[in-house]
């Protein structure tokens, strides 16, 4: 075999060996692939709480003289955003919608607004809400039946206050007072003040 051929084969073997060594070194120094990490998204619900209960309709007014009672229901939605600390979060309200149906055919109404809930202890809380309501009550400025409240117009302003206790992780019980009036925007402004109790289920 010619010397040039032997030299060529030697160079080829040396190159192959060198490339193999480089590949081995690269394999040893290459960082191991990262383990796949499970991304857990925070659980949230569009609906925050459901409430239902009973109330006495305007017990000190015309519609309450016959012990008029209502069936009530309310949906509270999740807060639009969360605050970084607990105190600030109390100022972020939950939107709500609800309704009240009278068993004796007196004033029914539907409402919407904002609710602020403040924890006094882990089990005890207070809350307030503001909003508006539409109703089918008396709006006749000339004559109001003696058993009806003169509400003047629709919609009305609605305010409510509650005190409540958490019975379990998801269940709560609260006493609520609500008031509806037109704030003097109509000639008649008797208004309605209802008191009652509600049960809430949180998601």
Regions found by a protein language model. Give the residues of each.
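Transmembrane beta-strands of outer-membrane beta-barrel proteins
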Residues: 48-52, 93-97, 124-130, 173-175, ...
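Sequence/structural signature of outer-membrane beta-barrel proteins
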Residues: 57-61, 80-82, 98-104, 135-139, ...
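Outer-membrane beta-barrel "beta-signal"
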Residues: 69-75, 191-203
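Residue-level signature of outer-membrane beta-barrel architecture
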Residues: 75-79, 101, 116-118, 165, ...
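Repeated loop/turn-to-beta-strand initiation elements of outer-membrane beta-barrel proteins
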Residues: 80-85, 122-126, 167-175
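Outer-membrane beta-barrel translocator/channel fold
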Residues: 128-160, 164
